[in-house]
Amino acid sequence: MLGYLVWAQESKPKAGPESAGGAVGGSPPANPNPYEPSKDKDESVACRKNLQKINAAIQAYRKDHQDVPNWLSDLVPKYLADTNVLICPVTKRTGHQSPFGVLDPKVRSSYLYEFTTTPIPEIVKGTFPGSDMTMRDWKRQQMKLAGQQVPLVRCLLHEPALNLSIGGKVYESPVYWELNFTNEAGLSAFSPH
């Protein structure tokens, strides 16, 4: 059930000679893009500002369309003219994007948009098995448990992760934001059903 978190842990570089610029003998490292979230506070503050701007754009979109967009790219250019807002400072520094979820097919973005109308990706289904459904349907199901705290947009490039909730609040959480709510319901209650 914790396959997605295990993958993240296995992707972190190991201590020893292999991690110092490549494997022994000059071979390239096993994973050239390890999942290594940033703990830099300045990057986190700048990312929060991006998420607040994204929230303002989503709220304007919702006012016009009575629903959330299918993708963050649906906000461009009418609701979000500056696409640099979609790039986290960690991505600017490292070039890395989120290793999990579904990335926007139309614009480069560091952020995972949780309310797409695409099927739940396999990497997520490995952790949260259950019915086949879209990300949007699953997140709306989770809203019955966590209400307005369900993430609409996430940045997993930080430790702790940053979340923009459907209610417009930016908050920190572990990679599994659902762990913040397991007192009310067990983790399995958040699986698609």
Predicted regions and their residues:
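Hydrophobic membrane-insertion alpha-helices, especially the h-region
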Residues: 1-4
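Conserved hydrophobic/amphipathic alpha-helical signal-anchor segments
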Residues: 7-85, 170, 180-181, 185-191
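N-terminal pilin/flagellin-like segments and related low-complexity appendage regions
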Residues: 61, 97-98, 113
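Activation segment
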Residues: 84, 97, 172-174
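Short cysteine-rich clusters marking metal-coordination/redox-active sites
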Residues: 88
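Acidic glycine-/aspartate-rich tracts in secreted/extracellular proteins
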Residues: 91-94
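Active-site-flanking ligand-binding surface segments in enzyme catalytic domains
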Residues: 102-193
